[in-house]
Amino acid sequence: RFYAWHDGRNGCFLGISKVISEKVKLNGVKLFEGLLLGGEQIYETPVKENEKDRQDLTLDVPWYQVGSGTKTYMVGMFKEETSRDIKNEDLPTLIWRNGMYRGSIFAVVGDYLKDSTASGILDGMLTEASEYSIYPIVNAQNLSMVNFPGFADENNEELMELYSQSVTGVGRDVIWPTLISIVEHSDLKMTCFIQPQADYKDGIEPDSEFLEFYLKQFKEQSAEAGLSMEYKSADSLEEKVDRDGEFFANADSDYRYGAAFAEERDLTDVLNLSEIKLLKNVSTLICEYTEKHPVVSYASDSITLQSVVGDGMHYTYSADLRMRSIQSALGYTNIMLNLQDIFWPQNEKDRWEIMERRFASNLLTYWNKFNCFTATTLSESDRRVRTFLNVDYTESREENVITLNTTKADSWFILRTHGEKIEDIEGGSQTKIEKDAYLIHAEDHTVKIQVDEPGLSYDSRHQ
């Protein structure tokens, strides 16, 4: 958390012209376009009581006003009746830059540089302080359906009471058609992490006929089947993996499972079981979002880890800011919907009609600005993650030609400029993301990007 003070010397250094108050209560914040991808965004505390839990940003802050030579990226907002008497430029400044003779000073008020939220903000600062920036990204957009489908009619009494159908019936006739519709509207691809059964002690076994049905459905929908390592009741994770292995072997299916979901606390145990036949083809793991691991990394020498970026059900403003930041830094997301509570409800809100409505709303509202990036399954994303983690590159510029040299052909980069547009590209292709931001596909080891002749060179000190 950053707190600055104004004593003449430090005020000039940070660009602060006046300290109005050591602490004020905000009603929200406004992020201006340019620092992160995705455009301008307002995070105002919702009026509706059932939506107020979305607001989880830091709202108790000092009120700084900045002077000339600064550029503001985020400001605090008051309630409408208070804001009427305050000019926009006088609102509390939360993220800004002060141009100095030999560079720039960036200041952040609040905890916006915590966890992975820092990644895109720091890349944005680098861009703002430079004539241009170009950096490698993953370019993968993932949608993970965890603990779906299931093939055992467990907890039937409760499911029959709620839906008049069994677990397998609810999955096939209620949930699956809705998921198809949501995915078609979002232009994303699904990876469904199968949970053959949840309770390994109740004597109810999974039915392999449903496996055959879903594998055909996945193929039609360009979806992928993965393995879920979660369970409700078993003597151990190893027992669960052994029992699942027997089920898949008896189903006489030759499907190769390349992705598996595990809770963060179980990752080490899953890695220790990776030589078991069921898991031998798994090349990537996913887990819920955690600050203990990078967004994408190696879990072992041969297996990657792709963290979930957002929970499709419980969406907050800090989660949205983190998602935008990760998209800006990596061109990557992994949205999770865990369906275990549908089949094993904990409260009255664990109903599919409630979950489906909220999930669809969140997905189509918050992620739709990033459809310039590629929709992938987790195994497709895995290949791009490996390229990203292993790529080395250099870049240089001579007049209006930027030269990118990369050790990995078929790699992806983001180019960010200040008003310059791409006129031509050799050795690759480009897609405009938004104003001053381009997705670069390096198809060869050397890419030459010609931008239009700038009228004036960019000077970060005076923008």
List where the protein language model places each region:
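Surface beta-strand/loop "capping" patches
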Residues: 375-419
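Catalytic grooves of carbohydrate-active enzymes
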Residues: 110-111, 132-133, 139-141, 145-149, ...
